[in-house]
């Protein structure tokens, strides 16, 4: 399925990711069940509510299949905001929250405050230059394991990281008109 990218469509802003992919000429396939992952080389996990995403992914059999495929190296992942939380090894203060655990990162939910404290900030992204970040109840990566590369920071805080074919951002690139981060992920995934 070259040219097709899955977007986890259980909850959150999956439509915005589909639009971002469409602008790049890439077909987006909504993933709501384990069977929808068949043939995909790449999956985007959108922002939304991380607890809900985790519970539904587990309930619909998606969690185990995604974990297996990532560990085999046959699936690239891009998690934004709540999606990044779901990818993390640990969620600070929420040890029981469902998570995929494929990114060696310890993530703090809502680290920049509540919805009313959302903000936008220009970031320097390694290899891309200046990129406009939209932070909405954004998480932050408090600790990173071996092999996790920081691609962008807000002050001293990592807000965009990569480990192999797993990419995770605290911010929402899908809420901008800038396609570069989605294009970077497509290249990472070989799509």
UniProtKB/Swiss-Prot annotation:
Keyword set, alphabetical order: Glutamine amidotransferase, Hydrolase, Lyase, Pyridoxal phosphate
Oligomer status and interactors: In the presence of PdxS, forms a dodecamer of heterodimers. Only shows activity in the heterodimer.
Transmembrane region(s): none
Metabolic or biological pathway: Cofactor biosynthesis; pyridoxal 5'-phosphate biosynthesis
Protein family membership: Belongs to the glutaminase PdxT/SNO family.
Enzyme Commission no: 4.3.3.6, 3.5.1.2
Enzyme active site: 81 (nucleophile), 172 (charge relay system), 174 (charge relay system)
An MF annotation (GO) of this entry: pyridoxal 5'-phosphate synthase (glutamine hydrolysing) activity
Organism placement in taxonomy: Bacteria, Thermotogati, Deinococcota, Deinococci, Thermales
Binding site for L-glutamine: 48-50, 109, 136-137
Protein name stated in the entry: Pyridoxal 5'-phosphate synthase subunit PdxT
Organism: Thermus thermophilus (strain ATCC 27634 / DSM 579 / HB8)
NCBIfam families registered for this protein in UniProt: PLP_synth_Pdx2
GO BP, sorted A to Z: glutamine catabolic process; pyridoxal phosphate biosynthetic process; pyridoxine metabolic process
GO cellular component: cytosol; glutaminase complex
Gene that this sequence comes from: pdxT
Catalysed reactions, as listed in the record: aldehydo-D-ribose 5-phosphate + D-glyceraldehyde 3-phosphate + L-glutamine = pyridoxal 5'-phosphate + L-glutamate + phosphate + 3 H2O + H(+); L-glutamine + H2O = L-glutamate + NH4(+)
Protein task: Catalyzes the hydrolysis of glutamine to glutamate and ammonia as part of the biosynthesis of pyridoxal 5'-phosphate. The resulting ammonia molecule is channeled to the active site of PdxS.
Pfam families for the chain: SNO
């Amino acid at each position: 399925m070259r040219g097709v990218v899955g977007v986890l469509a259980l909850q959150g802003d999956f439509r915005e990711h589909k639009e971002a992919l469409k602008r790049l000429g890439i077909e987006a396939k909504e993933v709501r069940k384990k069977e929808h992952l068949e043939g995909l080389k790449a999956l985007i996990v959108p922002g939304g509510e991380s607890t809900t995403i985790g519970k539904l992914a587990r309930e619909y059999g998606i969690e185990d299949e995604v974990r297996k495929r990532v560990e085999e190296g046959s699936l690239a992942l891009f998690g934004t905001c709540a999606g990044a939380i779901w990818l993390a090894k640990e969620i600070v203060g929420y040890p029981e929250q469902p998570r995929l655990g494929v990114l060696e990162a310890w993530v703090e939910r809502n680290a920049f405050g509540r919805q009313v404290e959302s903000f936008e900030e220009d970031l320097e992204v390694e290899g891309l230059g200046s990129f406009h970040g939209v932070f909405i109840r954004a998480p932050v990566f408090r600790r990173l394991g071996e092999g996790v590369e920081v691609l962008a920071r807000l002050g001293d805080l990592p807000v965009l990281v990569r480990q192999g074919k797993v990419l995770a951002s605290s911010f929402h690139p899908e809420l901008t008109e800038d396609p570069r981060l989605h294009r970077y992920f497509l290249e990472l995934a070989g799509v």
